[in-house]
Design a protein with these regions (language model features):
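Short, basic/glycine-rich phosphate-binding loops at helix/coil junctions
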Residues: 75-80, 143
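General beta-strand structural signal in soluble alpha/beta enzymes
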Residues: 57, 77-78, 110-112, 174-176
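Glycine-rich beta-strand-to-loop/alpha-helix junction loops that act as flexible
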Residues: 1-3, 79-81, 112-114
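Active-site-adjacent pocket-lining segments in enzyme domains
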Residues: 72, 87-108, 115-195
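Short, glycine/serine-rich, charged loops/turns that create anion-binding
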Residues: 5, 32, 82, 116, ...
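Short, flexible loop segments at the rims of nucleotide/cofactor-binding pockets, characterized by
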Residues: 2-6, 54-58, 85-89, 128, ...
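Non-catalytic interaction surface on structured domains
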Residues: 28-32, 55-69, 78-107
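N-terminal beta1-alpha1 cap of cysteine-dependent amidohydrolase-like domains
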Residues: 1-75
Length: 195
């Protein structure tokens, strides 16, 4: 997803809910003030489809997680927020192994903003998204590798920054507006872009 929750595009919601029954959602986030009420925004669109939804919210920056306790997730959501904090928290081999394992089991994985960015092999961090106000290219989880993504493209007016970043990485950076998304297969190939 290119922006923040909730998902407002019904096409995206319908693709997710029609693909499999969702009984358990696991949300990975990082600590920030008032984080708990915000988590409902990630799941509210699914509540009407699946009223008995079981949801777990995990903060890897403040707690140790046994990933084996979350192997029953049908939908994994990686939240948004401070991109560099998300990268420092989630870009590691253990989390990558968990995500790849869950994709191979058929779970759906959704990243919002920072959570979408870190799914790539490389991560484009816009100058609008860090305190140094510089273009940064960081390592990601490697779920996809043929391209990078730019989030909040429209609201950040990020075209010039994205174009400069493409010259640095010599690979396409796909722009995602706040209510856009890319649908990928489990190998990271693009199935569809929904605007």
């Amino acid at each position: 997803m290119g922006g923040n929750p909730p998902i407002k595009n019904h096409t995206i919601v319908n693709k997710i809910v029609s693909s499999r029954k969702i009984e358990r959602i696991v949300i990975f986030t990082v600590y920030r003030d008032n984080w708990e009420p915000y988590m409902k925004k990630y799941t509210e669109v699914f509540q009407s489809h699946f009223p008995n939804l079981n949801t777990a919210c995990l903060l890897l920056d403040t707690e140790q997680i046994d990933f084996n306790s979350y192997l029953d997730a049908d939908l994994i959501i990686i939240g948004g927020g401070n991109t560099e904090k998300y990268i420092a928290t989630y870009v590691n081999q253990e989390f990558k192994n968990y995500i790849v394992h869950m994709l191979n089991k058929g779970a759906k994985v959704i990243g919002f903003s920072a959570g979408a960015l870190l799914l790539g092999e490389k991560v484009y961090v816009s100058p609008n998204d860090n305190s140094d106000h510089q273009i940064k290219i960081k390592n990601g989880l490697g779920v996809f590798s043929q391209f990078l993504i730019s989030v909040h493209y429209d609201s950040w007016n990020d075209k010039a920054n994205k174009d400069r970043a493409e010259e640095l990485v010599d690979v396409t950076i796909i722009s995602l507006n706040d209510h856009s998304c890319l649908v990928l297969d489990k190998l990271g190939n693009i199935i569809e872009k929904i605007d």
